[in-house]
Swiss-Prot record:
Binds 16S rRNA, required for the assembly of 30S particles and may also be responsible for determining the conformation of the 16S rRNA at the A site. This is Small ribosomal subunit protein uS14. NCBIfam families: PRK08881.1 (NF006477). InterPro entries: Ribosomal_uS14, Ribosomal_uS14_bac/plastid, Ribosomal_uS14_CS. GO terms for molecular function: rRNA binding; structural constituent of ribosome. Belongs to the universal ribosomal protein uS14 family. It comes from Prochlorococcus marinus (strain MIT 9312). GO terms for cellular component: cytoplasm; small ribosomal subunit. GO terms for biological process: translation. Pfam families: Ribosomal_S14. Gene3D superfamilies: 1.10.287.1480. Keywords: Ribonucleoprotein, Ribosomal protein, RNA-binding, rRNA-binding. Part of the 30S ribosomal subunit. Contacts proteins S3 and S10.
Amino acid sequence: MAKKSMIARDVKRKKLVKKYAAKRKSLLDEFNAAKDPMERLEIHRKIQALPRNSAPNRVRNRCWATGKPRGVYRDFGLCRNQLRQRAHNGELPGVVKSSW
């Protein structure tokens, strides 16, 4: 189980990403469309003025059951240990153990 403070920090980051997503997207579109270097610099400063934790790449993909940050399968949102355990218990519909 991950530390509660780390899980809370990640939840806070997800909220910030959602809050600033539209503003960040519009600024990035302006930045990519701008041709003048001074205009690009000004837009870049506006992007830098946004909270650092509002960038989507700062959000860590975590297991929703344990909060572990590593070995997380995107399709399920579970870490490998929980995925194996729940698949064996039949709690994941459509997941079967492979054999050939």
